[in-house]
Amino acid sequence: MAGKKLKKGKSGNAAQYITRTQAVRKLQLRLSEFRRLCILKGVHPREPKKKPKGANKTYYHLKDINWLAHEPLLNTFRSIKAHDKKVRKARAKQNKELAKRLAALTPTYRLDHLVKERYPSFVDALRDLDDSLTMVHLFATLPAESKYDIPQRTVQLCRRLALEWQAYVVRSGALRRVFVSVKGYYFQAEILGQSVTWLVPHALSQVLPPDVDYKVMLTFLEFYNTLLQFVNFKLYHNLGAALPSLRVYPLFSQLRYPPVLDPRLEEAAAELAAIMKDIAGMEEEEPEEVDSEAGDEDDDDLPVLDSGTRRRRAAAAGPAPRRWRCWVRTTRTRMTTCRWVSDRAGGACGPGVDPSDEAAVCGSLFRGRVFFLGREVPREPLMLVIRAFGGVAAWDGDGSPHAETDEAVTHQIVDRPKQGHKFLSREYVQPQWVFDSANFRVLMPTDLYAPGTVPPPHLSPFVGEADEDGYTPDFAKTVRRLQDAANAARLRAAGLALKGADGSEFVGEGADGAAAADGEGAAGEDLAAAERQYASELAKEDEEAAMADIMMTRKARKMYNNMKQKEAAKQERVQQLESKKAKLAATGAAGPMGQVKPAAAGKAAAAKAAAPAKVAASGGKGAAAKGKEAPAPAKGKGTPAAKGKEAPAPAKGKGAAAAKEAPAKGGKDAAPAKRQRR
């Protein structure tokens, strides 16, 4: 008995998927509006296994299109479409006043419900925050071009959101890694157990390429701005709720979000410091400066705030009593003074820092150190890293807590080959010293990063210990020794060091090394028995591996062989790098930390540039080998004479280069040989 016949398009891929043209017709939207709605709702095209309408079409799931049909933004988009027709009609009739009035009455919409819909919990929003932060920081550096419909208000909003995020990272001490590349600065922060990574472009003049669809990027940015506002609001209020003073005195909660920018610092292009002065206080200010400048700040900050939320809250709260303001100023002054004294006496290896607590180690790494940033170094990335790791940042300009001549400055960040005037009471380092010290959780030696010297290789902190079997540079081994020494110092400072330690500078593995030494001492009683037992264990492991290989299925064996091939290729690559490093060390082209010396690099470049000229002068296409026999030319091509040796006979009877006696060792290259004619 035959089965029931099914109608075409009622089941399978034809019933589950729909083309983009069909979706646009069903929703009664323009293609640009449909694309915008899909971006805001998070609907992506699908790839069915069998495409019923053709291979060159874009498909969407039918359930997604039905879900879009119930979106409230559809009515708003249709209203905007009808309103645009009215504006165009008024402009066609040369009625400028009506067109201007209608353009000001364009329907608006909000995306708050979409954020709550796509991210049910706050942790979900943090997990999907990487692209949002990268896009916001990108548009914060772009110019407002009317040619590409990039409004100035959007750029200013991105700038404000980026600074608010950086200020929270500094205040909470959540920054963990930073890496400088050609694309920009990669930052990674740990917030509520979630790792958030974003990219900040270099502060250069941006040239907008014409082949980029900025409308699509602005649509993504529209949703990302709303998402980041939600996240910043939640993070700031969580930070405020953690402070006991905010629970006792609710007036402080008005300063949490949005933070108030200091007009003086904002005009001096120190936006991050301007926000930090409000949410955390300028820890690097002297007590006298805090008391003198905070006289009427509580009254002056309210009118200059651009946010309507802050003005409404301030109006509802009313003016604060003068006694209350005096108590607030006195409390801030005392807290700032206490922090100043304790920070100057602390540090990464100071007492009270638990080595197992990464947040405490990161927050106290630069404690008690004042960094003066030169005019040639990037201020914002360095200020973000320095303040997030407990340091104090100063610069040349208005609003700086310290001047360049201040004796409190311990480090000066410069990026010049030579420094004219130097202070003996401070260290002069390159910007890479700050990033490497923050990544490795240890203060690196300053002589390696002195001005005018080639710094060590900038190792990526995102690789970490995941590539233990791969190539390990020499500088990474040096960093590990420094980290072991720093961890041992922190253990001693915290009172957790084991008694009876030898007190050496570089403690290798700590307690694990002591336990291993005890095990070796116990096994040394019967060394021969231990060796026999070890050999038997190896044989047993080999036998088990062979048995497991026999019992594997064909698919599992193929996968296992692929894994072994990849591991072998990896080991071969490591051996190549090791041999290359050995050759560079033998020729003296590599420094002690693996960096290429400038002199050696210049000699290599000069030799490479002079090679074509020597070949042209000799009339051949090969180069004379120093102290070695030149290889035989292919297809009758001549070669220059080898130094001190006779060149081999040419193939097929064609011309060869006449060998001549080379000068003494250490002299110039051999004289070019004359080419014979047939």
Swiss-Prot record:
Record keywords, A-Z? Coiled coil, Nucleus, Ribosome biogenesis, rRNA processing
Q: Where is this region: Disordered?
A: 283-316, 563-678
Q: Organism's domain of life?
A: Eukaryota
Q: Provide the primary localization.
A: nucleus
Has the keyword Coiled coil been applied to this entry? yes
Q: Where is the composition biased (Low complexity)?
A: 597-618, 630-661
| Segments traversing the membrane | none
Pfam families named in the record: Pescadillo_N (PF06732)
List where Acidic residues composition bias occurs. Answer: 283-303
- Subcellular location, in the record's words? Nucleus, Nucleolus; Nucleus, Nucleoplasm
Q: Which GO terms describe its biological process?
A: maturation of 5.8S rRNA from tricistronic rRNA transcript (SSU-rRNA, 5.8S rRNA, LSU-rRNA); maturation of LSU-rRNA from tricistronic rRNA transcript (SSU-rRNA, 5.8S rRNA, LSU-rRNA)
Coiled-coil segments? 552-587
Which PROSITE patterns does this chain map to? Answer: BRCT (PS50172)
PANTHER family given for it? PESCADILLO - RELATED, PESCADILLO HOMOLOG
Q: What's this chain's function? A: Required for maturation of ribosomal RNAs and formation of the large ribosomal subunit.
Protein name from the UniProt record: Pescadillo homolog
Species lineage, top-down?
Eukaryota, Viridiplantae, Chlorophyta, core chlorophytes, Chlorophyceae
